Amino acid sequence: MITSVKKQGYDIIVVGGGIAGCCAALAAARENKSVLLVEKHINLGGLATIGLISWFEPLCDGEGRKMMGGMAEEMIRLAVGCGYDNLPEIWGGTSGNAQSSDRYSTHFSPTFFSLALDDILRKNGVTILYDALATYPKVDNNVIVGITVENIDGRLLYPCKAVIDCTGDAAVASRAGVPTRTYDNTQTYVVHDTNRRHAAEFVDSGNMTKLRHWQWFKPGAETIGEVTAAIENDYLRRSKQMTLAYYVGTDKNEREILTLPELPQIRLLRAIVGAETFLGRVEDIDKHVANSIGS
């Protein structure tokens, strides 16, 4: 029988080091809480970095008015602080490679953004535990009081006062018995590649987004329902086969895949059933949410 070794406790444990998890950990640390961030991969940023969706959605309304600030704006600044960008000049862009529109949005370097996330969390006192899988929460009287983690050291129990589930599929909440629901997903697969033509365009323009090119694939049906392990692995198998088939037969000395995604690029897996749900879909356009804290 494998027993759990009890480790140091924390005020807050954040499970999942995607953008949401990083923001949650940073916010908690700035409130002088002791924070442990548990991440199963070895780099931060989730879908935005190791998932290769390195595009920051607009923070404006399309008419020159900023609609979001706070940590969202802090993250877009962090994303372009050390790596390339194509942020418009009116929003502080300095690359000279802005998009044709003036939206407050940008492409960014997924690698530099991941490193920047690690840096800002450590500077704010967050303890990061990489290459660690949060398996099951410890629940006492319907309250999560700890997280069981498995890594190279074995099975560890980290006590806590509160847990923030940023796994992307409500893994902690679901295993604690919290009601959850699933959503339909569009199947896409993105890799970053380059070739001789892209390199020439970069040399001519100095625009790094010309060199790091997104290549999209559609490995299956338009939508899938609940994502199981079998469905996820089938999606990954088809995605990899489709990707390889696309490049086979092209000149191997003219092109290169720069990066493959290190996690499934699935947007909606499972979520906690909240008091209110707003997805921004067509059916939500006229929906009024009285307790919205956004714009």
Predicted regions and their residues:
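Basic/polar N-terminal segments that are highly enriched at the extreme N-terminus
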Residues: M1-V5
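Beta1/beta-strand and adjacent pyrophosphate-binding region of the FAD-binding site
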Residues: K6-G18
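Loop/turn elements at helix/coil->beta-strand transitions in domains of secreted/extracellular proteins
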Residues: G9-D11, E31-S34, N124-T127, L156, ...
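Conserved N-terminal/central alpha/beta ligand/cofactor-binding core
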Residues: A27, K33-S34, E39-Y136, D140, ...
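Flavin (FAD/FMN)-binding glycine-rich loop and adjacent Rossmann-like elements that form
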Residues: L47-A48, M71, S114, D131, ...
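Short, hydrophobic/aromatic-rich segments at coil-to-beta transitions
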Residues: N141-I147
